[in-house]
Amino acid sequence: MEPGPAHRRRRPAVACSECRRRKIRCDRGFPCGPCRKSLPALSCIYHSQPRAYAASAPPRPHTAQHQPRPKVNNTHSVDLTKFNLPSFESDAFHGLDQFGIDWQPSWEHQITPPTGHLADAGADYFQSPTFSVIDDHEKKESTNHSRARQGYPGSTETINPGSVSHSAGVNPDSGDDRWYQILARIGKVEYLIRDITRHQSSDEAQLVPILRDLYEAEPDECLRLPPLSGIVLKLENQARLQKQQDDKQSLARLSPLLDASSKIHQLLPPRQACKKLVSAYFETFGSVLCILDTAVFTSEFERFWEAIDASRVPSTDHEEAFAHKLLVVIALGSVTCPSSPGAASSEAERARQTSRRNHAIMCVQHTRQWLAQKTARGIRADLDVAQILCLLALARQTQLHTDPWPRRPSMDGTVILTGDHDLARLGMQMGLHREPRTGSMAKPAKEAETELRRRLWATMLELSLHQYLDAELPPPLGADSYDCATPSSNGVEEEPRSYFVPDSLRVPASTVLAALSRTQRLRLRVLEHLHASGASKDIQESQRLAIELSQAFNSEVNSLLSPASTQPTSFQLWLLNVFVRPFILALGVPLSGESRNRFADYYLRRLRLENAVAMLRPGPHEDGPRSIQSQISSHAGQTGSRTKTAATAYPFLPTPGTAEPCNTSSEQHFGTHKAACTSLYIGGPSYYAVVHRQVVASLCADVVAEIEDDMFPNLDAAMLHRIVAILEDAVNEYRDQVHASAGAHACHEFILFAAAHSLALASLNRSSAREVKESVMSSVWMALHHCCQAMGEPAEAMLETEWGTEAVQQTATESQSVNRSVSDADKGYEIDAQLQGVKYMLQQQSDAASTADGEIADMWAFDDDESYLSVGLPL
């Protein structure tokens, strides 16, 4: 019997099929670099790749999102040690290897590396998500998925943070790339988006050459980024690296306060600053969500500081719980406190703001560490623990938490973070979802406790609804599975006095929470319709729920804005819209597989436009003259003649020497609370910033489609002009953020939204195709010019050119200047001297804890020359 053919071992392919065909070097990535950079994008396939080798290759972005989530187990105990959580991502601690292990040896002072808890606290601050390239292949894939792939404000992100190294220049503060896909619905700016996202995975040393090759290879009708964009992205990467280094230094100096031997009062700011931060919390988050009883909190605050003055430490469980409530309240209050007017762009002020934010992260981490220790000993949830968990959930939405936002699905299991409990399920285990049975002879104290439980249940359910919407999970309870009454609109406790809004102009937080509570059952039905298995997902049911929820919510808003009643603040209206309208927008995304109906598409687009405008302009008092009266050319915004916006003109924190209360005019009240909103939704990776980016992108795409359809030109003319004006204000807010952060934040948003706004404005003015193209490219050029100025580099010195037919030729003649600006001295990305920030360093002391304690006092010391508003609580 003759032997068979010799066995030949299959070996992995050394190059993909496309690289073999093109006879070029393949980097064996998945996809490889040449296929990723090609235009149009090529299919990167390894034909001889065995299964084992294919499984070991890194996954493509967007792959993990479509995997099923682990089911949430039911719980029958309030013991937090056995309490299961909803699905959270397994990569929440991505980036720890670059945070607490390899410290830079070139630092000026020897700094003690942070502890593991500090690394947890900073993990979210140094996230390195990957922005995918929106090519034709991915667009075809996206049409085959369900509603979750379409995207809506508050939906889950589509990025894979482990696919690109941190040094690739990826934005660590964006948090999502869903807004890229939403904005890519505008066909004329799609290539601009592809260019700016393609840079995120490109070799840093080849940014400009790659872009020049792409620009020359495309037809003339394509709108492409100018070569200056490569330099801007390089400078942006340098600014972020400098910011990360400053964050590491600041967090390392504060890390000794997480030791078991440190006392909690060492983390607290001075008493005067602590009062202002507590006041800022109650004027913002506390004016919507009734987590704390304000009267009880005020009295306990006074007793707490008396104990500190007497050198007494918290001894009882209740005193410890209050101390950690205070830590998280201070952290939340610091987030809504912008800098002083005119100082936001200075390096010293940016260093102080960085230190304050890192201090807030440490306060939240200290509370999580305390809660973990209590949980290990078998703590049982009571009202104090429930309040702390609500505050931690709110801190997670503001990105003062290690849980990155939005959450990403994963089939590798879930990461359980201390304090990340399913609040709705916990509330049911505590019995908060049941209405207490009280008789007619109930005592006042019992009535107050009953009202507190109602408010706490409404707050816990409200915070949980957004977890379910973001994680695409069905709720653990139905719309009719709880009978807890709506919180009373009239406060039982006495509201704390505030100079922000006098009592005669104040809407109690209980009134706003009651309005939210009356829409919660409808939103539970929306979640069941969207994510429950076996639920009907036809477009008619989605439209019916959207109409019902819109009508119910509009009725609540109209009652709050009634001329006969007290008007809510702009922050209350903004947060109210952010909590409810993303559910309507989720219903406005068409399902895949549905037959396209032009009239249905038109209705859904109008629905998205209505809700996006309401979220960007929540109150009628915002319909007046805009804060920035600039046209498209003002996107560049000369820094010397910038008009002060509400985001910088009305900060919260006062000067201690100022004794008189502030002016109570409605304009000043609007500016004060508008500043708090802007500090939350502009820049950074918080939930509010993610929602805001997606809302602006949705508004850009829908208004351009509305202008192009031109179905009702006479009726819609005024409306479209108003929407374009709202977009202009949003672009200018991102422009101000670029200037305030020295280019570390919002560069991509500013460039792309400026291009979309210019396209909408030119199309609305009936410009020709050539004029539209020139307008868009002029706006992009001016936006890049402003980014260079914000980062301390004059654009004229790097690229002397105007947009026209000779742009590419002029770029080639000045390649020496471009290459000199782009090249790095070494692979460690040494920061140029002009981008060096003022290092906020204390002199080295022997006791690290006392050094950190002194730094906290310095960062919260207010100078007399800072024009802060006079704000105070009777604490």
From Swiss-Prot:
A GO term, aspect molecular function: RNA polymerase II cis-regulatory region sequence-specific DNA binding
Family matches, as CDD domains: fungal_TF_MHR, GAL4
Keywords assigned: DNA-binding, Metal-binding, Nucleus, Transcription, Transcription regulation, Zinc
Name of the protein this chain belongs to: Transcription factor tenR
Annotated spans, Disordered: 54-73, 136-172, 620-642
Its job: Transcription factor that positively regulates the expression of the genes that mediate the biosynthesis of tenellin-type 2-pyridones, iron-chelating compounds involved in iron stress tolerance, competition with the natural competitor fungus Metarhizium robertsii and insect hosts infection.
GO BP annotations, alphabetical order: DNA-templated transcription
Cystine residue pairs: none
Record-linked PANTHER family: ASPYRIDONES CLUSTER REGULATOR APDR-RELATED, HEME-RESPONSIVE ZINC FINGER TRANSCRIPTION FACTOR HAP1
DNA-binding region: 16-44
KW Transcription (keyword) present: yes
Keyword Magnesium part of the UniProt annotation: no
Alphabetical list of SUPFAM superfamilies matching this protein: Zn2/Cys6 DNA-binding domain
Pfam families in UniProt: Fungal_trans, Zn_clus
Entries under InterPro entries matching the protein: Fungal_TF_Env_Response (IPR051430), Transcription_factor_dom_fun (IPR007219), Zn2-C6_fun-type_DNA-bd_sf (IPR036864), Zn2Cys6_DnaBD (IPR001138)
GO CC term (a single one): nucleus
Composition bias type Polar residues, residue spans: 153-168, 627-642
